């Protein structure tokens, strides 16, 4: 088995190669909004470094959002392309599942990612050992976020939420890697071809022409 994992849901992109014995290699970089010109090149370079031929790839996993509109679109396009070319399954991994993963089976946690315009993607995870892709995220106004025992989001979003959440225990997100995408995908029950994105928010609109 050779699994390719792709994460382009934020400004930090990453790709990983996973084999029968675990992680083979992974790379991450600050891509900004340049996902389309960098991700496939980085994957090709990683495969060459590990002497892996594209035809030997047997499974693909990709972060399907919510997150960066352009990044998600690029990552899913590459994943679907690999799946079609090799006639292999592709597994979608929810980006909020990645944030909640460190607390899986330990205690309940609410996780969020900013969607802009005063709204966020919000999901509540139970203390049980939940299964990937079973917790639904909601597009929620920031002012409507309920209190939670433990909350995980980036520091910029927490700065907006802290005044209304009071004594909620805040956890910054742990460093999410493309290897985590692979790990979650291997525990996921369903494969999809093609993968559909989870956007929730509105796309960023270009400025009007002067």
Predicted regions and their residues:
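DPxDG-like acidic metal-binding loop motif
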Residues: 59-90
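Residues at secondary-structure transition points
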Residues: 30-38, 69, 73, 77, ...
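Short amphipathic alpha-helical face segments that pack within enzyme cores
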Residues: 38-41, 77, 81, 98, ...
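Oxyanion-binding and handling regions
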Residues: 1-22, 34, 91-210
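Short glycine/serine- and small hydrophobic-enriched flexible loop segments
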Residues: 44-45, 84, 183-184
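N-terminal beta-alpha supersecondary unit
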Residues: 1-64
């Amino acid at each position: 088995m050779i699994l390719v994992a792709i994460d382009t849901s934020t400004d930090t992109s990453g790709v990983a190669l996973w084999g029968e014995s675990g992680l083979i290699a992974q790379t991450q970089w600050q891509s900004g909004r340049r996902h389309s010109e960098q991700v496939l090149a980085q994957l090709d370079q990683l495969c060459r470094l590990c002497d892996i031929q594209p035809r030997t790839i047997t499974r693909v996993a990709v972060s399907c959002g919510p997150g960066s509109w352009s990044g998600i679109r690029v990552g899913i396009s590459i994943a679907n392309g690999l799946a079609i070319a090799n006639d292999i399954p592709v597994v979608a991994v929810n980006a909020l599942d990645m944030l909640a993963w460190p607390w899986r089976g330990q205690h309940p946690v609410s996780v969020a990612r900013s969607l802009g315009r005063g709204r966020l993607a919000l999901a509540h995870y139970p203390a049980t050992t939940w299964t990937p892709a079973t917790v639904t995220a909601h597009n929620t106004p920031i002012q409507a976020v309920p209190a939670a025992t433990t909350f995980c989001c980036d520091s910029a979003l927490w700065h907006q939420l802290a005044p209304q959440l009071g004594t909620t225990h805040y956890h910054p997100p742990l460093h999410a890697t493309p290897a985590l995408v692979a790990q979650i995908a291997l525990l996921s029950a369903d494969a999809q071809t093609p993968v559909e994105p989870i956007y929730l928010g509105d796309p960023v609109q270009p400025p009007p022409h002067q």
